[in-house]
């Protein structure tokens, strides 16, 4: 975890941790939505951890490149840290780019013991074959520019729950770019936990 900006809520005696992976852009864990996910998970009496990828620390808009080498290496470092903390169950909650990075991670480091939730699935970018044993839930906006929930369901199959957020875009905002559907996403996460 050296060199990373992160938030870590360690619930005493908890064997479950939720690892929250932010989406694209230079803000990372400081976005209101990622912070709200972190706070919501902490209220469920589970441990939670979220961190910035190095490109955020450099205030860059984009990830390290098409193979996401730096991001996969960083995610491995974080998951290794989580294992040393003694957790029995790891669930990744990945927003958008975080889902893509998770796919690259599982392609390189398969681990069926880690569950994956994707908030805003991006077809043709997510390595579905690499995450097929991990993916449990997708929460997708009805008006997501990358794929409608029905398209996502066709890709991920019947073993994965796909929840549609009516009228929401990829960031769970309305047509005026107001994030009015993000609380609905948080409610679905809590119900799933």
Residue map of PLM features:
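Alpha/beta-hydrolase
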Residues: 21-24, 119, 165
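Serine-hydrolase catalytic machinery in alpha/beta-hydrolase-like enzymes
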Residues: 2-85
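Short beta-strand/loop motif that positions the catalytic acidic residue
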Residues: 132, 137-140, 144
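Catalytic histidine-centered segment of alpha/beta-hydrolase-like enzymes
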Residues: 168-182
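Acidic beta-to-alpha connecting loop that harbors the catalytic carboxylate
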Residues: 142-145, 166-169
């Amino acid at each position: 975890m050296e060199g990373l900006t992160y938030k870590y809520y360690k619930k005493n005696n908890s064997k479950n941790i939720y690892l929250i992976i932010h989406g694209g852009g230079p803000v990372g864990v400081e976005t209101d939505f990622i912070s709200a996910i972190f706070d919501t998970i902490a209220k469920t009496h589970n441990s939670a951890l979220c961190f910035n990828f190095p490109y955020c620390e450099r205030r860059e808009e984009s990830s390290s490149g098409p193979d996401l080498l730096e991001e996969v290496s960083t995610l491995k470092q974080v998951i290794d840290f989580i294992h040393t903390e003694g957790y029995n169950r790891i669930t990744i909650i990945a927003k958008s780019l975080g889902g893509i990075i998770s796919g690259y991670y599982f392609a390189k480091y398969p681990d069926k013991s880690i569950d994956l939730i994707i908030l805003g699935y991006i077809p043709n970018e997510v390595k579905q074959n690499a995450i097929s044993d991990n993916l449990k839930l997708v929460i997708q906006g009805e008006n997501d520019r990358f794929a409608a929930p029905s398209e996502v369901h066709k890709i991920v199959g019947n073993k994965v729950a796909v929840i549609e957020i009516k009228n929401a875009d990829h960031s769970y905002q309305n047509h005026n770019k107001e994030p009015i559907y993000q609380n609905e996403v948080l409610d679905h996460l809590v119900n799933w936990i």
